[in-house]
Swiss-Prot record:
CDD domains documented for this protein: homeodomain
Protein name as catalogued: Homeobox protein EMX2
This protein's UniProt keywords: Cell projection, Developmental protein, DNA-binding, Homeobox, Nucleus
Tissue expression summary: Expressed in immature and mature olfactory sensory neurons (at protein level). Cerebral cortex.
Gene: Emx2
GO cellular component annotations of the record: axon; nucleoplasm
Biased composition (Basic residues): 225-234
GO term, biological process aspect, one: stereocilium bundle organization
Gene Ontology terms, MF aspect: DNA-binding transcription factor activity, RNA polymerase II-specific; sequence-specific double-stranded DNA binding
Family: Belongs to the EMX homeobox family.
Disulphide-bonded residues: none
Subcellular location: Nucleus; Cell projection, Axon
Taxonomic superkingdom: Eukaryota
UniProt entry tagged with the keyword Mitochondrion: no
Amino acid sequence: MFQPAPKRCFTIESLVAKDSPLPASRSEDPIRPAALSYANSSPINPFLNGFHSAAAAAAAGRGVYSNPDLVFAEAVSHPPNPAVPVHPVPPPHALAAHPLPSSHSPHPLFASQQRDPSTFYPWLIHRYRYLGHRFQGNDTSPESFLLHNALARKPKRIRTAFSPSQLLRLEHAFEKNHYVVGAERKQLAHSLSLTETQVKVWFQNRRTKFKRQKLEEEGSDSQQKKKGTHHINRWRIATKQASPEEIDVTSDD
């Protein structure tokens, strides 16, 4: 019976890689996209090398790239050998219209950039607290933990700037009584055009300052007393005089 000729496989790169005379019109042709190259052809198929030379001669006679679809038509006209795996090559317009899909998911670093940038900057919430309701993240995320802590902080208390006359009145009241409560504090605050909270805080701070000054004075007095005793003891040792405790007042001598 008639035996069909064995199927032969070739690559487009093998056609254009051979040294062949090119027509003069090649320089005027537009640049075509480079064909996809495969691995170097191995000598497994004995008919492959001979077919490459014949196909190159045929392509040289017709002119390389004389037709935009020539490269792909050559590949279609000769079915590939089943022994050699060959992947179909799509035309250039198909490549442009359908880009290759990504084989893996995007990197987590780039995926995280799609999130709300405010979750990475707790100082933004601390600075603009009235926008806190717009920045709600996952309750279990560490970024959200930082944001909630920043929002949960109590605002700093504004320090009251007292006038000299107010300070003088407060000092006089403190000398009379270190604790002002009830109606007395309310009356004092009304006379100074202050709130009861401001008067209360001032007296608390003033009592703390008074105790600190008292401790410092007692500490300095004790240090001076110790220094004086030390000098007296040294003078007695130098002059070999007995201390008052060592003098026997019951002796008749």
